[in-house]
Amino acid sequence: MTEVTKINPSTAITELEPYEMAQTNKEVPTTSLLSKDYYGHSIEEPDENNPTRWRYERPLDTVRAWQYLIDCDENFKTKPHREQNQYRPTADSFRPLSFASMESKLTQRLSRHLSKTSSRHSRL
């Protein structure tokens, strides 16, 4: 038995286009959508190139978040959220690695020099 539905064929002609629906539906401001990350947390410092991402978000975190959104991985929900495992840069983290290795070399040289001078003074 077939069901008879009452569909008006002229609705396709008279219904609003998506851009018209967006203009008439002003309930949700777009700024509130942009200030949330993948988990629904608010973004205090958005990235300049991508405002839907936190400023210091690592690329791997972005990939994992997208993977979660695509696969709906249940194990992902049990992992800590962004605030708990996110990289927080400090002044030392922006120092080039060559300076860090140079500093350790200078410290080693200085300690060797001080030990040599102290041994010389003890012989006198």
Curated annotation (Swiss-Prot):
Q: Which residues form a coiled coil?
A: none
GO biological process entries? regulation of cell wall (1->3)-beta-D-glucan biosynthetic process
Q: Which InterPro entries match?
A: DUF2406
Q: Which GO terms describe its cellular component?
A: cell division site; cytosol; nucleus
Q: Check the record and name the Pfam families matching this protein.
A: DUF2406
User: What does UniProt give as the signal peptide span?
Assistant: none
Top-level taxon in the UniProt lineage = Eukaryota
Q: How does it assemble?
A: Interacts with dil1.
Tell me what this protein is called.
Uncharacterized protein C19C7.04c
Q: Which organism is it from?
A: Schizosaccharomyces pombe (strain 972 / ATCC 24843)
